[in-house]
Amino acid sequence: MDTEDTSSASSSSVSPPSSPGGGHHHRLPPKRRAGRKKFRETRHPVYRGVRARAGGSRWVCEVREPQAQARIWLGTYPTPEMAARAHDVAAIALRGERGAELNFPDSPSTLPRARTASPEDIRLAAAQAAELYRRPPPPLALPEDPQEGTSGGGATATSGRPAAVFVDEDAIFDMPGLIDDMARGMMLTPPAIGRSLDDWAAIDDDDDHYHMDYKLWMD
């Protein structure tokens, strides 16, 4: 009886050997590096170290330190050109002008230089370089009609054109009085004729003398 129990227990404890091809092995998918896909989708197609943010309305820049995994954040800029200039300043500060891969290789001499290779000095020089290439704002469009605006009382606002000035010529030249003087003068006998009325009356009316009717000048 004991022999049977011992044999049954030993047989149950021994598991049958598994065949080489019968086992199931679950393979884990390869680990993906976090953030690389987003980096590829947002980086600028031309400029180094420049990525888009906020749907492409803003551009950020960062550079990797040599012999290190750390990155230096250089800021956010309104245009990719400004971010690219900031990258060039940082690249020159970290790798030197000859060893740096620049976005604008023809203009390193026009960029400000960082005092040291510390992240603070690099960020300061990068911001200064970006400001040198900030685009000026577009000019404001002037309204076609400058009288569109109205004042608080509802009256039309005056434009920059000078207002028409009324000149009273009658008041300046005293036209009413001048006309009265002319009228009175027409009713008087001219001085030259008044002195020689007797002589004119004595002149005979013939072909050799000119006859003048001076009754027009008499009252």
UniProtKB/Swiss-Prot annotation:
Induction: By calcium ion, methyl-jasmonate (MeJA), cold, drought, and high salinity stress. Residues 46-105 bind DNA. One of its GO terms (cellular component) is nucleus. Its main location: nucleus. Mostly expressed in developing seeds and apices. The keyword Transmembrane does not apply. Pfam families: AP2. One of its GO terms (molecular function) is DNA binding. Residues 23-41 have a biased composition (Basic residues). It is found in: Nucleus. Residues 1-45, 134-161 are annotated as: Disordered. Keywords: Activator, DNA-binding, Nucleus, Stress response, Transcription, Transcription regulation. InterPro entries: AP2/ERF_dom, AP2/ERF_dom_sf, DNA-bd_dom_sf, DRE1A-I. Residues 7-16 have a biased composition (Low complexity). Belongs to the AP2/ERF transcription factor family. ERF subfamily. Transcriptional activator that binds specifically to the DNA sequence 5'-[AG]CCGAC-3'. Binding to the C-repeat/DRE element mediates high salinity- and dehydration-inducible transcription. This is Dehydration-responsive element-binding protein 1F. It comes from Oryza sativa subsp. indica (Rice).
